[in-house]
């Protein structure tokens, strides 16, 4: 075998030996010591600069610890022992320690549809409770009128669950029923019929119909209502929906007097002395809103038109007067300027006469 072939063979065997040693240490099968047979071909340096023989010897490989470089003990044929260190070294553990990073996880809890629905239901219940606690206008009116004498109280309208009052029968009657201070019930139907019932009567069955008649000399648009029942003292107070009404009969006269807390559509009526004589049991109710007949409406429109025209005429007259005053002022100013102009012309002629002889 030539020298080149020997060198290549030795290098190849040395690489294989070193790789096997490193693999055995990395696997960790022998943590304390590793004993194995390895074949090593060493080249001894002599004065002739050549490799005399190729020896195969048994060596003992030891490792000081895991991760340290592998050191192989090689015994030559001449009896000399050589320590051979592996070329490939395992990576050393880093001395620098990485800082410990504390990981914090933030979890967001989203509201589900059920929670949103439950909140909506709670809000609706609260709103209903607030609305149910609000007193009705009738309750407020009764509280305000409790200290005022002669003002009747209106019964609260009970809900459907509580049922109808015991003294009013449950029947479909398209009327508005009111209770007076004397206990009587006044029902006003849609057609304009007014009915009165006594306190002892059972519901609306005891209502008395009031006949609608016309008087000989009532005011235009007035309504004549006949009733049959009055209180013991001759006074009666009741509420009637609508505008202000004047009521008269043979003995008494009813005039509207609004309370401070009244809503405007529920005027109170008080009794006064009569001014005219009407048939017995007949009252005259005249509403100012019903007095506007077509003729009166036309007269009102004509009156407004005449008033507007009169204001326009007065404004035009004032405008003409101011224009005349302005023209007179301008005329007087022109007259003054003309007089001044004449004086200046005369002075100019005089100056010319004075200057002309000197030039000659």
Curated annotation (Swiss-Prot):
Residues 303-328 are annotated as: Basic motif. Residues 330-351 are annotated as: Leucine-zipper. Residues 19-52 are annotated as: Disordered. The keyword Transcription applies. GO terms for cellular component: ATF4-CREB1 transcription factor complex. Keywords: Activator, DNA-binding, Nucleus, Phosphoprotein, Repressor, Transcription, Transcription regulation. Transcriptional regulator that binds the cAMP response element (CRE), a sequence present in many viral and cellular promoters. Isoforms are either transcriptional activators or repressors. Isoform 1 and isoform 2 are transcriptional activators. Plays a role in spermatogenesis and is involved in spermatid maturation. Belongs to the bZIP family. This is cAMP-responsive element modulator. The lineage of its organism: Eukaryota, Metazoa, Chordata, Craniata, Vertebrata.
